[in-house]
Amino acid sequence: MAKGYLIVNVYSDTIANPVENATVTISKNDKEIVAINTNEDGQTEKITLDTVDKSYSEEEQHETRPYETYDVSVTALGLTPTKIEGVQIFDEITSIQNIYLTSIDENQLEDISEVTPNTLWGEYPPNISEVEEEKEEGIAPFVLREVVIPANIIVHDGTPNNLDAPNYTVPFVDYIKNVASSEIYSTWPIETIKANILAIISFTLNRIYTEWYRSKGYNFTITSTTSYDQRYTRNGTIFEPISNAVDEIFNNYIRVGIRLEPLPAHYKSSTTEDGYLSQWGSKDLGDKGYNALEIIRYYYGNNTNIYEAELTGPYPYSFTTILRQGDCSQDVYTLQNILNYIRSSYPGIPVIENPSGLFNSDTTEAVKKFQSVFGLTSTGTVNYQTWYMLSYIFTAIAKMTNSIYS
């Protein structure tokens, strides 16, 4: 039987507060398969689980669901027991399930949520075109001065006019990983995955740039429904190939010709409609050796290009250059102090004794451990993606401890 893998990360409220020694139980059909405790960084070891063959995720018309599902239950002292149903496991892929526990509420015995099916497998309402939506609303969107990557976006978990649906504040990068994991299959060629991620990012940034919903009086950035936007799954499973690709290109987006705004890059599972990316079609192009930009141009036109957006948000340290062992600079000194600070919440990261600004072997080991904990490629070299994550985690911990920002 095919095998897939699962890593569970357990936090108390935020990523700044990992939970050590939480009990994680994996079950299927109410039968326990494995129970394991989290380590000092709130993480389980990689768990091997049975699943279906990856060929089912490579054929559009297959009648067998291309992944297996399991339930994950977590208990920890002083926190509400939590259960995520329908955690998805693909053949040869590592799934990442982040679980956020809350303080015990005497009115809630257990917090239960479900990972809904991937949009390529489940049944979801068709998208309403923006032209038709504009006709209905009769309102033109605003535009911002520049294209930026926000720290967070607000996701409305329902249709725009459903006032009972909750709003969730989600880190931008986490949102993109969630949508991509909900919309495509992680077993596909990496260039196909990147092309779809670029479409997802561009669509999202267009919603931000045009203030699509806020200009109409709504208090959110985007919805979770495929009727209007793209699928966001609360507590959804994230897949390692998708996570790694997002970390690599999260600040990239598509533009057409000399137009400044991000392309509102529409896509469907299978379509020949002009101006839409076909998800299954992009998989076929990836199989043929097309790279991400070639796939993008195949669907959106040869005058499309990829641009980088600036980051905005409460990040106290900007990226300047790649850092590696042997470097000696103020940036290295800052890096060493950031790592030691993060270690206050993640004690599995080795301490760097007497930070001096010299990128020594101790610094390399600390960087490798940090990268491993947060799902980055463990090279020991600090690139843009690692620096962004360092700054993000530093800020989250600082907020939790009220060290910076009110």
Where are these regions (language model features)?
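Conserved, single-site charged/polar hotspot
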Residues: 21-23, 37, 47-49, 73-406
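A short, solvent-exposed loop/turn motif at the edges and junctions
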Residues: 54-85
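Short, acidic Ser/Thr/Gly-rich low-complexity loop/linker segments typical of extracellular
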Residues: 31-58, 348
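Short, ordered, surface-exposed loop/turn motifs in non-cytosolic proteins
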Residues: 14-33, 37-40, 332
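Intrinsic-disorder/low-complexity, polar/charged segments enriched in Ser/Thr/Lys/Arg/Asp/Glu/Gln
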Residues: 3-5, 43, 96
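Structural motif
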Residues: 2-3, 7-20
